[in-house]
């Protein structure tokens, strides 16, 4: 048999994207962009409806950092609508639930890394992913891929997670107590 393996890199995998988004948020990057990127990785314990509602709300209202930390209360359809329909209320609830989960996790992460060294930052990023449900979501994704595309594809998805987590471990090992500016 002829095997034609394609070289792959975890650089653009969901785990790497999630870690990059978290690090960008720690550096003070735009919350709207990075929180929606994080939500769309599929590694947060959010339903597809919650992710869509969050992204639509963020697109409609362009919340600043302060607005992300406050409860979402505006009509998901925008300025022109006064009365909330049942669908609007549901979308608002989904967006608010997603906002709260993401912002709470990121704010906890910020508190843990403030003035921290490389080891503390690596550990805090891992535990933030864990708080967001990333391990369970990744395991579910691997099983879905196994059922749809077979064992080799599932093993590749699992490898992507393992490589990114190993990179966090190596950062902690190599830099240890060194101060790192995120």
Please provide the spans of the model-predicted regions.
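Polyanion-engaging groove/track-forming segments
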Residues: 1-182
